[in-house]
Structures are given as C-alpha cells and as structure tokens.
C-alpha cells in the first residue's frame, strides 16, 4: 500500500510512524530505530533524528529518543545494537549525501535476515537512489532483498513536489489506521498526475533499460578521469549515481564547475557527486568529461 506525501523527508517521517504503529498494534513495546552512520533521511524532526551526520542533528537536540547508529556495511555493528526494543532498521542501499557508499550484497541480505528473525521492520530510503538510477526500478531489486517499507520522492514527480512511502500488505495490516497520519496536499491531483505521467514514460521509453546501457560508459569515463589525475583517488557508486574522491579543495572544484556550466554537488568528505539525468547520452557524458579535465588540470 502506498501513502503519498509532498517530499522525501515527509515520506521518511511517514515510514518511521508506520514502523512505530506496527509495533504498537502488535503490542511488542518496540520503539527504537537503528540508522546508519553517514546517512541522510531529511531535515524534519523525525527524519533528522535518524540522519547519521552530527552537523545536521546537533543544532536541534534533543531529538526523537531511541535512535542508535551503526556502521554502514558492518553487519556486526548492527547486530550489536539490536535488542528487544528495536522497532526498525532504516538505511539507504546507496548513500548519497554520505559520500556515495554502496551497500554490499552480504550487508543487505544480513539486514533482511536479522529483521526476519527478530520481527524488526526493514526500511529502505530510496528517495535519491530509486527510480531506475542504479539499473533497477528500485535499488533493493538489484539485491533481491525486499524491504518492509520503501520511501521514494524526487524522480517520481520529475520536479513536481511529491513523495511516497510504500508498505507490504502484512505491515499495512498492523500499521497506520485512518487518522493516524495525514498530509494536506498528499496525493493531490496535480502531483499524482505527474507521477502517473513519469511512470508511463519510464515504461514507454524503457528508461531503466537505457540506464543499464549507458551506465558502463559513464563508469568507464569516470575511471579515465581517475587514471588521468592524481588528485582523483577513488570512484564510487553504481549506475547513474556515482562519485569521485578528490584531494583538491571541493569548493575550488565547485567554483570552476560553475564557470564551466557544469552542475555538480559535494557529498560527505571530498567527494564530487555525479547524478545525471536518466536520459543522458554518450555525447553529454563526453562533454562532462572534457569540462572535468579542464577543472581538474
């Protein structure tokens, strides 16, 4: 079942409430969340409470109680935090703001198994990495690991303010009831028309197929930049959501990019984040690479 919101932050707020309501209905007494270090889930109160960056949380403390942070891609770290009060584990299959870190297959499978064994809900935040960006409609599909709750936004409206969180039927049966949650403009006709149109275009133009065709070329060109410039130490990511670790000051890189007419953004640490349109072609990637060569020289 799907509940429409106005943004990704709102989608994550709804997901957290849905998880708490699930535990409440079952009478388990569970309320704690385990989130990941370097994660980003939004700036509203609940979403920022599960965001793994001190810089986002500290100015607004005390925040929502019962949140613990585990090391991303470290299953033992997660296991050490699980107890009888754990309600849900929330993670991004591919961390964007946190520095373009991709979850391993072992980690995703381990989280799913841990949740199944302890009646804990698995929440995947795909606000940024979903909608075809990693080569499947949603990133979790690339792992074959289905979450209990999925959040999405950004690309589902192609610029129109809209987000959503989806629950499995089992979770929905125990979760939000009429009056538990609401959004004045959630599911409004304009936003939902945009979503319907976007999904139609995805299917008609095989957008996910295009991502899979173009992504290897994108990766190849980023690897060329890494090989060519000593200041580029690592390439990270998957599909059309990738990053380069740079030793030069990122502000300097960003300023030069603006001069070149190239829109890039910094991720956690010295990482340049590349999140091109899903309809990008080789010629656009070539133009980007030439601009980056001038910027990094």
What are these regions (language model features)?
Residues 1-297:
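Conserved N-terminal phosphate-binding loop of PLP-dependent enzymes in the Aspartate aminotransferase
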